[in-house]
Curated annotation (Swiss-Prot):
Gene name for this UniProt entry: thiM
Name this polypeptide is given: Hydroxyethylthiazole kinase
EC number annotated for this UniProt entry: 2.7.1.50
Pfam family name, one: HK
Gene3D superfamilies on file: 3.40.1190.20
InterPro entries reported for this sequence: Hyethyz_kinase (IPR000417), Ribokinase-like (IPR029056)
Transmembrane segments: none
Catalyzed reactions: 5-(2-hydroxyethyl)-4-methylthiazole + ATP = 4-methyl-5-(2-phosphooxyethyl)-thiazole + ADP + H(+)
Keywords assigned: ATP-binding, Kinase, Magnesium, Metal-binding, Nucleotide-binding, Thiamine biosynthesis, Transferase
Lineage of the organism: Bacteria, Bacillati, Bacillota, Bacilli, Bacillales
Function: Catalyzes the phosphorylation of the hydroxyl group of 4-methyl-5-beta-hydroxyethylthiazole (THZ).
Needed co-factor(s): Mg(2+)
Native source organism of the sequence: Bacillus pumilus (strain SAFR-032)
Length: 271
């Protein structure tokens, strides 16, 4: 995949202004909504089971995030997901901290069984826990350093889950079970602000709504987000994570298709 595809998709997202329905966690709701607005998409944050199926029918993409789960939230996610499947829009799953508790793992597997998921995005530990693969550690909802083969893991996950899988980290990787693409953009400051991964999943949702193959749409979103993070870090300089959060929102608005074309770094991995 070339960076020109990502550049084109960014412009298409901004032209079409897709409505992204988020059933997400309490910690990141505001940041996610503002990030989608900065990108050029439209967010809606509806989680009441009385309306989620109807809301999903209005949306162009649906994002399910298990960061602050309740039994009622899981019910809403299933209703919204099945409604989105009927409409034929992309559904994304962010299995935040899925290895932390039995409840989270059970909920994530329930969603994968009852909803046709287009893209799963998580860190390496989260994806490994979904597959019940040993050797990848987590701390609460965060990943710890590991020495495993992330490219092999993402390809295995995509095959097993029969969906596109994105693993984010120092290098981001995405696979559809056949190809593995790696994105070499981003900045360490992304790990210092809560919600940057959750927002990324919603950004991927906006790109998937643009109609490209989920593999390419996911890679394009990763390129855009990584370039925006690098630009935000330049403006942050020696300041703190609060400044970076603000500058990331600014960069999501100001990063152009030409920025992605010239600054994006993508490779194709052989596993």
């Amino acid at each position: 995949m070339k960076t020109s595809i990502a550049s084109h998709l960014l412009e298409k997202v901004r032209a079409e202004n897709p409505l992204v329905h988020n059933i997400t966690n309490q910690v990141v709701t505001n940041f996610t909504a503002n990030g989608l607005l900065a990108l050029g998409a439209s967010p809606v944050m509806a989680n009441a089971k009385e309306e989620v199926a109807e809301m999903a029918q209005l949306a162009d993409a649906l994002v399910l995030n298990i960061g602050t789960l309740t039994k009622e939230t899981v019910e809403s996610m299933i209703l919204a997901g099945q409604s989105a499947n009927k409409k034929g829009i992309p559904v994304l799953l962010d299995p935040v901290g899925v290895g932390a508790t039995t409840f989270r793992l059970k909920a994530a597997k329930q969603l994968l069984e009852q909803v046709n998921i287009t893209v799963v995005r998580g860190n390496a530990a989260e994806i490994a826990h979904l597959l019940e693969v040993d050797g990848w550690e987590s701390k609460g909802v965060d990943a710890k350093a590991a020495n495993g083969d992330v490219s092999a893991l993402v390809k295995q996950a995509a095959k097993t889950l029969q969906t596109v899988v994105v693993i984010t980290g120092e290098v981001d990787v995405v696979s559809d079970g056949e190809d593995v693409l790696s994105i070499h953009n981003g900045h360490e400051w992304l790990t210092k602000v809560t919600g940057t991964g959750c927002l990324l999943t919603s950004v991927i949702g906006a790109f998937c709504a643009a109609g490209e193959r989920p593999l390419h749409a996911s890679a394009a979103a990763l390129l855009f987000y990584g370039v925006a993070a690098e630009k935000a870090a330049q403006y942050t300089q020696n300041k703190g994570p609060g400044t970076f959060q603000m500058e990331l929102l600014n960069a999501l608005s100001h990063t152009t298709g030409n920025d992605v074309l010239t600054l994006g770094k993508i490779g194709r991995n052989v596993t």
